[in-house]
Every structure is written in structure tokens, then in C-alpha cells.
Design a protein with these regions (language model features):
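Loop-helix junctions at membrane interfaces
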Residues: 1-167
Length: 167
């Protein structure tokens, strides 16, 4: 039991680091923020780890990316949105890319696009301006989905879930 908790914690920390890198370092500035593929790694974490670990990895990795990339105003919204994103996926399925997790992409997209639209509308006091960010959020969720599907298929091919036994 203790070994499994340590393994989960280490995997969550590794995911937080990867999420940070693919959010903070490999991003494209758009509108009032930036777009990135870090969400694809949040999706993967949520398919491999129980919710609290995946939520922490997403919130910490993406939140720190905002703090250290000059977008600290986005930190509170990011922490909430990314933690909730982990709820959209299941770590209990035998495979990463399965019907359940493919269906989870839809609410994950809605959370990202809708969550950041609402957050930007609140912090700017102008929902008209917030509408301008939606195309960037769409690019973000679609590119993150491509990363998730490619890596998920590859990891399923080497049976990573049965090898790690994180659930």
C-alpha cells in the first residue's frame, strides 16, 4: 500500500514537471494569454492516476507555468480549471484511449474554453474582449487532444497501465 502511494506521488510529480514544461516553455502567446499542449499531459495523467493525484499534477504544473511565465493573473483560474479537467477522465479503464476517455474530451474542452472565457470576462470586466480568446482556447484543446491521442496510443501499445499498476 505504501509503495503504491509513493509510486503515485512520484508519477504525479513527474507529470507536474512535464505539464509545466509543455505549458511554460513550449507555448505560443495569443490574445491575453498563451496556447500550449500541456493539457494533453493533464489528460494522460488523469487516465493513469487517481483523481487527487492527477488534479494536483495539472494544477501544480499549469499553475506554476502561469506564475513563472508572466501570466500570474491567470493562476487562480488555471488551478481550478486544470484540477477539474482531471475529473473528465477515468484511470480505471484498462487502456488510456478508450470510449470512456474519448467521451471525457468533450467536457474537458468545455471546461477549458468555457472556464477561461468566464475567468477572462471576470478579470477584464468585459466578456466581449473575452470572446476574442476563444479561438486560442480551441487551438489549445485540439492540439492537446492530438498529443493525448498520439501518446495514449503509444503508451497503450506498451501496456503502460498494467506495467505501472497505479490504480
Amino acid at each position: 500500500m505504501k509503495h503504491q502511494q509513493i509510486l503515485r506521488l512520484c508519477c504525479a510529480a513527474a507529470f507536474a514537471a512535464v505539464i509545466y514544461v509543455f505549458t511554460a516553455i513550449f507555448h505560443i502567446p495569443v490574445h491575453t494569454g498563451y496556447t500550449h499542449v500541456g493539457d494533453g499531459f493533464i489528460y494522460l495523467a488523469a487516465c493513469l492516476l487517481p483523481w487527487p493525484y492527477a488534479a494536483a499534477a495539472g494544477a501544480i504544473g499549469a499553475g506554476l507555468a502561469d506564475l513563472f511565465s508572466g501570466y500570474a493573473i491567470w493562476f487562480p483560474g488555471t488551478v481550478i480549471i486544470k484540477a477539474l479537467t482531471a475529473l473528465c477522465f477515468s484511470h480505471q479503464a484498462e487502456r488510456i484511449v478508450c470510449v470512456r476517455n474519448l467521451a471525457g474530451l468533450i467536457p474537458a474542452w468545455a471546461l477549458c474554453i468555457g472556464g477561461y472565457f468566464m475567468y477572462e470576462g471576470i478579470i477584464t470586466g468585459n466578456f466581449g474582449v473575452a470572446l476574442l480568446g476563444i479561438p486560442g482556447y480551441i487551438v489549445q484543446v485540439l492540439s492537446s487532444t492530438a498529443v493525448f491521442l498520439a501518446l495514449g496510443k503509444a503508451l497503450d501499445g506498451i501496456r503502460i497501465k498494467s506495467r505501472l499498476q497505479l490504480h
